[in-house]
């Protein structure tokens, strides 16, 4: 028991000794560690202080350099200000001297003005004594003389300016017109009233005439033309002042000759076919003209009337070619003057559009042209250009004036017009117009310069006993209205057909 207690005591003592030793060792290790950390902290502190001192020194150096730079700038600016100030002082001194000189001159000028005024007053008084006129009267007389002289000079200058302006305007207008005429050229097509149809041989003439002349009479009656079958070999002449009727008849006869079937029924049928074809041709011609001139917004009916002008002549001049030429000349002049060239082109093309229908309707070509232009939506400038190109009304725009000038240029070209043919056509139209105005007559055709007249009477409203009265009325009307040289023959045709169709 005592041993155990002794062992326990020894063990406890040993444990205590070990703990003491461990504590001592631990304390020493901690102390060494702390001393190391303190040393490292001191080194870090020294490094931080060193870096801080270095950075402060660098900033201080930079600041001192900047400060010195700013000081230098201030010194330079100060020097510049001093220089400018010195310059201003010198300039001010110069200005003061100049002002003093001006003051001296002004003083001298005032003295001279006063002397001049005194002398002027003295001179006026002496003049009043010499001339027995007051200064007001003398001034009025002087003004009168000056005004008279100035007025004369002004009138002379105005007259000179007007002469120069007229000369310049004439030269300019001549250049514009010459330029327009040189730019466009239109062939002159002489008017004719006959077409020649070539035959394969002279035996065909018998076919054309037909039994007892039936084919020839039917053809002439339905076509409204005269067919001349004479001794000219292998040729038949179709005569009519109406170019469309003449063209339809020519095409019909040529087609019948190809088919080799010439008889009244075939003639009537082929005439209707050719009438339809000529209408299509007229429209095609109209659209060709529109393409040539660059017009793409014209009413179809107006386009058709333009095409119809190809078959119309005036004083021997083809109206379509004339209208196209007028359009181009008017467009060129308008372009030179800075006006609406497209509007001038359109107005020039349509200025004679009434001639496409004046042989079908009553009225002048101007009146009819205005009527159709307004009907198919042309604007007032175009309408006035049509209405005014023969001076029937006043021209309301520059375009109307240009169209009238272009029309005159085209018409006045050498060889462009033939008055004798135009007079002949006017006479033939008048004969047909008089005949168609008589009640009972449905169609009138004039041939051989009006010496041969064929009238077709309405078989429903007239009978055979009325023919003599109708012819007498026509004869008297023609005598009173138209001068026709030579002997006149009037043939009246009354034909009634009755067709019965049954099963």
From Swiss-Prot:
It comes from the Bacteria. Gene3D superfamilies: Hypothetical protein af1432. GO terms for molecular function: RNA binding; RNA endonuclease activity. CDD domains: HDc (cd00077), KH-I_RNaseY (cd22431). It is found in: Cell membrane. Its EC number is 3.1.-.-. One of its GO terms (cellular component) is plasma membrane. Keywords: Cell membrane, Endonuclease, Hydrolase, Membrane, Nuclease, RNA-binding, Transmembrane, Transmembrane helix. The chain crosses the membrane at residues 2-22. Residues 319-412 form the HD domain. Disulfide bonds: none annotated. HAMAP family: RNase_Y. Belongs to the RNase Y family. This is Ribonuclease Y. It comes from Mesoplasma florum (strain ATCC 33453 / NBRC 100688 / NCTC 11704 / L1).
